[in-house]
Amino acid sequence: MLVVEGLTCRFGAKAAVDDASFQISPGGFVGVIGRSGAGKSTLLRTINRLVTPTQGRILFDGTDVTALRGKELRQWRARSAMIFQQFNLVGRLDVLTNVLMGRLATMPAWRSLSQTWPEHDKALAMSALEQFDIAALAAQRADQLSGGQQQRVAIARALVQQPDIILADEPIASLDPRNTKIVMDALLRINKHFGITVLCNLHSLDLARSYCDRLIGMAQGRVVFDGAPSALTDHVARELYDLEATDVMGGSPVPAPEGIPALGTAAAA
């Protein structure tokens, strides 16, 4: 189980993440939603420890992730695989080698420097590519692929890390609708087929409601909504994104339903 307790991350006087607390049970597909600048990316990077928190704790299966250093920290980063919007592939290398990069944390230094990959790791990487229908591209340079193909390579790289949790930081932000569906389906397959927990930053409310079994809403660095997609009413979404009804609904303004708590209240958490 992932437990986030009072997590705060400051850059100067600004709190990018401000006293965030929540728990995620194994096997969940959780979406993090909110406006740009709400703290979503910083939250995921702090969980992975790419960013050092100012205060608070991150626990995973009882281990204090915020206290990890050296080899143990590298092992945690392998267990909490990051998927980035920018793909972070090495363009001049072939697809298979890019996927094999996900195995570096398991290799001795001499193997990683020489990129001498064990046959078991090669088989694991090819299997991951097959999962996402891109095995035929294994020998192709990564910079010759489309954006959707590159993101699937990045997801395959995350899968070969054999992680406990995948942290996907706006993985579809630069993709067209067709590739958006392909990438989201790939993440859902990892979640359902392999039982890997997925924590995914998303801008689209429609996608968040369609793919996620739980949503965490952030505003100004704080968690202001935590619940099932069905609980994210249009009234709550308007408050979360500071939008007019027409921006959320795509139609005429409608009155807010009665009995819906304001964001940040106990009932909305």
Curated annotation (Swiss-Prot):
Belongs to the ABC transporter superfamily. Phosphonates importer (TC 3.A.1.9.1) family. Part of the ABC transporter complex PhnCDE involved in phosphonates import. Responsible for energy coupling to the transport system. The complex is composed of two ATP-binding proteins (PhnC), two transmembrane proteins (PhnE) and a solute-binding protein (PhnD). GO terms for cellular component: plasma membrane. It is found in: Cell inner membrane. It is an enzyme of class 7 (translocase). It catalyses: phosphonate(out) + ATP + H2O = phosphonate(in) + ADP + phosphate + H(+). ATP binds at residues 34-41. Its EC number is 7.3.2.2. Residues 2-245 form the ABC transporter domain. The lineage of its organism: Bacteria, Pseudomonadati, Pseudomonadota, Alphaproteobacteria, Hyphomicrobiales. This is Phosphonates import ATP-binding protein PhnC.
